UniProtKB/Swiss-Prot annotation:
Belongs to the acetylglutamate kinase family. ArgB subfamily. It is found in: Cytoplasm. GO terms for cellular component: cytoplasm. One of its GO terms (biological process) is arginine biosynthetic process via ornithine. InterPro entries: AceGlu_kinase-like_sf, AcgluKinase_fam, ArgB, Asp/Glu/Uridylate_kinase, NAGK-C. The gene is argB. One of its GO terms (molecular function) is ATP binding. Pathway: Amino-acid biosynthesis; L-arginine biosynthesis; N(2)-acetyl-L-ornithine from L-glutamate: step 2/4. It comes from Prochlorococcus marinus (strain MIT 9515). It comes from the Bacteria. Pfam families: AA_kinase. It catalyses: N-acetyl-L-glutamate + ATP = N-acetyl-L-glutamyl 5-phosphate + ADP. This is Acetylglutamate kinase.
């Protein structure tokens, strides 16, 4: 890279850095990026860079592949219905062990290695994520968010720490729930008055033509996002992600992004460049 290109990149990023300094950005970390060492390291550096220029990142994570590995080790067959993991008591124990004890700490360790300061917590800590049983209970201990109590996060963010949160919630009676990390991220973004919600996925973003990767919808508004759902342009796995973004925007988040986590440094490319890399939905 020659000097003029370096200067051009920095010049393009500067107004975004100035605009988002002091603002909170919630990032849902998941998908293939969690399985690829090179992508993981790039993600940790991206989060560290955001923090170093004054942005306040908050990371929400799932950990499906790691959960499946541990279920396999314990000779338990994973069960899914309508894309959601059926979670009985034994599976919930493993989900808690894996998300809180392994995946969360791996992310914290990775970010801390960059020189930034991450703090690992779960939705159980300080009743951060309160939940109830999802739907008719046919998925067992799968839950949905009823309330976010962000008081635990506020002093951490104010002191420059990066919260890393596992997507487990609980009822007022202390019953734990496994919750979709996308929806946790959306509800949390609204609760902490975040500037942005960013979902890292295994797709380029929202496609206008389902099987055409060149048909990426770069920037749409809330009304257009709803029309995409009505016209079945958005469906399958992209449907809950888009619904999550719509709900977050309706609750005051300024912008929501669905981006391809399989591209190295996609987070920085989306936030700090004019063209971005995925789909941005504006309120």
């Amino acid at each position: 890279m020659d000097d003029s290109l370096r200067v051009s990149i920095l010049s393009e990023a500067l107004p975004y850095i100035q605009s988002f300094s002091g603002r909170k950005i919630v990032v849902k970390y998941g998908g293939s990026i969690m399985e690829d060492e090179k992508l993981k390291k790039a993600f940790f550096r991206d989060i560290a860079l955001l923090s170093s220029v004054g942005v306040c990142p908050v990371v929400i994570h799932g950990g499906g592949p790691e959960i499946n590995r541990w279920l396999s080790k314990l000779e338990i067959s994973p069960k899914f219905e309508k894309g959601l993991r059926v979670t009985d008591d034994k599976t919930m124990e493993i989900v808690e062990m894996v998300l809180m004890g392994r995946v969360n700490k791996q992310i914290v360790r990775g970010i801390n290695k960059t020189g930034s300061l991450a703090v690992g917590i779960s939705g159980l800590d300080g009743n951060l994520i309160q939940s109830r049983e999802l739907g008719d209970g046919s998925h067992g201990l799968v839950g949905e968010v009823t309330q976010i109590n962000p008081e635990l996060l506020e002093p951490l963010i104010a002191k420059g720490y990066i919260p890393v949160i596992s997507s487990i919630g609980s009822t007022t009676d202390g019953i734990s729930h496994n919750i979709n990390a996308d929806f946790v991220a959306g509800e949390l973004a609204a609760a902490i008055n975040a500037e942005k919600l960013i979902l890292l996925t295994d797709t380029p973003g929202i496609l206008k033509e389902r099987n055409n990767p060149n048909s990426l919808a770069k920037q749409i508004n809330l009304k257009e996002a709803r029309k995409f759902i009505e016209k079945n342009i958005v469906s399958n796995g992209m449907l809950p992600k888009t619904e999550c973004c719509i709900r977050a925007l309706a609750q005051g988040v300024r912008a929501a992004h669905i981006i391809d986590g399989r591209i190295e440094h996609s987070l920085l490319l989306e936030i700090f460049t004019n063209s971005g890399i995925g789909t941005m939905i504006n309120a």
